[in-house]
Amino acid sequence: MITVRISFKNKNEASYISLLDMQRVMQRVLKRSGLPVWHTLGFNPHIYMTFACPLSLGQESECECVDVKTEAEAPDFAQWKEALNAIMPAGIEVYNVEPVQMKADLIAYACYEISYPADAAPVLAQYNALESVPVEKKSKRKTKTVELKEYVPALELHEAGEWVYFPICLPASQDLTLNPSLLVAFLEEKFGLPAANANILRTKFLTADKKVFA
């Protein structure tokens, strides 16, 4: 049996599909595709699948992936890609299908590009002069304060037409995961930049030794 990684982009209207609904979408698409994916056993068999790192509602991504299994001996992955894209909902595009090379638990960081309207650049630049950026990370059990400057010491601003954007990489491991929305919320509270004006795009995952996860 082969474990297969389906890598896809998730943008525009698809960014508002929740994880639970995304699981349903993938189950439905894989069933309709007729591809030889493996189903779990038992009274309620369903397609085996695991997602690497859930994406928050409203955020876009160029690097999402879901792992499935197949008992096919020589899968035609180009045909898999074509079959899936033919029936994917708008905003979801499969860009690669191949056997799993790295296990999902190797992910240590998630990298993003956060964009604002270009006139926000002078305000964003003020972040770099701050000595401390404490934010509250909430979980089901507790709330703790995290020093964001440890992970985002400065914003490296780039202009792109009517937008200004900056790249960041945040922890995304089993030990600690930080959502970029924490930074966006801080920028709104501290500098008055509306969170609704920010566009968050996940660009890649990194391992602990900063290799690109694939």
Task: Show where each model-derived region lies.
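Hydrophobic, proline/glycine-rich low-complexity stretches
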Residues: 1-8, 14
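N-terminal ordered "arm"
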Residues: 14-39
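Short amphipathic alpha-helices in soluble, non-transmembrane regions
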Residues: 78-88, 123-131, 182-184
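Short, low-order "capping/linker" segments at domain edges
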Residues: 104-119, 153-154, 207-214
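Short beta-strand-to-loop capping motifs
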Residues: 8-10, 68-74, 114-119, 168-172
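Short, charge-patterned binding micro-sites
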Residues: 38-68, 101-103
